[in-house]
Structures are given as structure tokens and as C-alpha cells.
Amino acid sequence: MKLDLFKWEKPAWIVSSLLVLISIFAMAISWAQFQAPFRPGLDFVGGTRLQLQLECASSNNCPAAIDVAEVQDILGGVGLGNSSVQVIEDYTLSIRQQTLDVEQREAVQKALNEGIGKFDPETIQIDTVGPTVGKALFRSGVLALVISLLGIIIYLTIRFQLDYAVFAIIALLYDALITMGAFAIFGLVGGVEVDSLFLVALLTIIGFSVNDTVVIYDRVRETLERHSDWDINHVVDDAVNQTLTRSINTSLTTSLPLVAIFLFGGDSLKFFALALIIGFASGVYSSIFMATTLWAWWRKWRSPKNPPREMVAEV
């Protein structure tokens, strides 16, 4: 497999820029609606979530899917019109409210049974998270992301040089932004909420993406050692093509079980797997088209009249 990297450099950057703009736009709309870049789940905002499933779902003979507007009207009738409502796989209902005591919960279940149909009491799930715990969990997740990025910068600076580290971080931030933008869109269009597993997914994506980038950078360094008289673009193109098959195969084999989890897993695991699929695909793309071309541009700009030389750091 042969890729003419710099032939596709401009189209790749145009696509990347469009995806970044779409992601930022989606997160801006989410911020206006939810005061967060995506629809926050119970883990982050706190409150109580009540999940119920229609009794007919077990025998697969329900006459119609649950209608969100109808549920909102019923909840409004019991004084809970400001609840967040989500329908899962047509026949399962998830209701989130900041406060939902026992009396309110019983009133909701009674109203829903009368207005929509009989819900199976054995499938009822109730989760409660305090607002303080939710905020602390969010802060801990963000702190973990920041620490991981700082650790990557230090590691890559020691193993290679600072400019390698900077452009690798730019590629990682791109992967995180694209994944967050996708879930901002899912939240706006499909009501998908983000929970603590999403932060775990972002950390996993960062680790996967930096691994791809390190492999390519390692080939860049080796090629510079052997061919210090080569043009920088030639060096980068050669390094990318040496690792291209490996990057694609690794991504595909990693994504196959994630696709299975997405198709057959529970709701939380389903969107966790989807985040990883998006992030891993973005990681392969950014390590090939972003981290490398940025580094090549910087090296040519820094010494345009000099033949490329590399001060190789010993690992």
C-alpha cells in the first residue's frame, strides 16, 4: 500500500478544518442549551434517573413505540414537566429529574401506566447521584485528561524533541475535539447523554492515538539517521508508508470488538464503544495527516535553506 502523503495534504486539511468547525458549532449550540459542550448525563449534573420498560417489550408485541411528547405531557400533569426524557430502543423510557422523591416516583409510574401502557415493575431502575458528587467526578475526569496530556508532552520531549511533542498533542486534541463534537451532535439530535465512561473513552483514545504517532515519529527519526540528505517531505512520506499498513490493520482489529459491543451491548457500553470507534478512526487519520505534515512544515520553515539534519535523542 502506497500513499502520496503530500498530494493529499491540502484536501486532508480542508476536511479536518470543516470537521473542527462543525464540532465547535455543535458544542456551542449544546452549551447554549445545556451549559455544557454536550448533553451531560446523571454522573455530572446529579439528580435521579428512573428507567422503565413496557411490559409488552418482553414478548415483542407492543402496538407502538413510546412517544416523547406524550411522556412530557404526562409528566407535566404531575408537576414534572421540566424532566429530561429519553426513549431507548422504542419501548424503554428514561426520565431524569433533579429531585424525585418516593411520592413523585409513584405518581409518575401511575400516570405513565394509565397514559401509555403497563410498565414492567421488574425492569425498573433507579439511580441517584448528588450534585456535589457529579461536579467532583467531572473535575476529576478533566484533571486526569490534563495530567495525561502533560505526561505525553514530557515523554515525547525526552524520547524525541519538543516539536515532536507539540504536534502530537495537537493531533490528540483534534481527536478529542472530533469525538466531543460527534457526541454534541448525538445529544442535540438523538438525546444521547454523556456519562463518566465518556471521559474514560477520551483517555483511551488519547493513548491509542499517541501510540500511532510515536510509531510514525520513530520511523521519521530512523530515516533521518540513515538519509540525512533527504528532503523533509520525502522523509515523512517514507515513514508514513512504512507504518501505514500497520496503522490501518491495528485500527481495524481493535474496532471489530467495539462494533460488536456497540451492536449488542447495553446502553452505557454502546455509546462508550461508539466514542472509541470514532476516536480510533480519528487517531489513525490525525497521526498520518496531521502530526506528520505539521512537523514537516515546521522543520522546513525553521531552516528553509539548510539540508535537514536531526539531533537524535537516545532513548
From Swiss-Prot:
Q: What coarse category fits the chief subcellular location reported for this protein?
A: membrane
Record keywords: Transmembrane included?
A: yes
This protein's UniProt keywords: Cell inner membrane, Cell membrane, Membrane, Protein transport, Translocation, Transmembrane, Transmembrane helix, Transport
The highest taxon in the source lineage is Bacteria
Q: What is the lineage of its organism?
A: Bacteria, Bacillati, Cyanobacteriota, Cyanophyceae, Synechococcales
> Per the UniProt record, which residue ranges are transmembrane?
12-32, 136-156, 166-186, 188-208, 247-267, 271-291
Explain the purpose of this protein: Part of the Sec protein translocase complex. Interacts with the SecYEG preprotein conducting channel. SecDF uses the proton motive force (PMF) to complete protein translocation after the ATP-dependent function of SecA.
Tell me the disulfide pairings in this chain: none
- NCBIfam families, from UniProt? 2A0604s01 (TIGR00916), transloc_SecF (TIGR00966)
Q: What is this protein called?
A: Protein translocase subunit SecF
Q: Which PANTHER family match?
A: PROTEIN TRANSLOCASE SUBUNIT SECF, PROTEIN-EXPORT MEMBRANE PROTEIN SEC
Classify the protein's membrane topology as the record does: Multi-pass membrane protein
Q: Which residues form the signal peptide?
A: none
Task: Name the family.
Answer: Belongs to the SecD/SecF family. SecF subfamily.
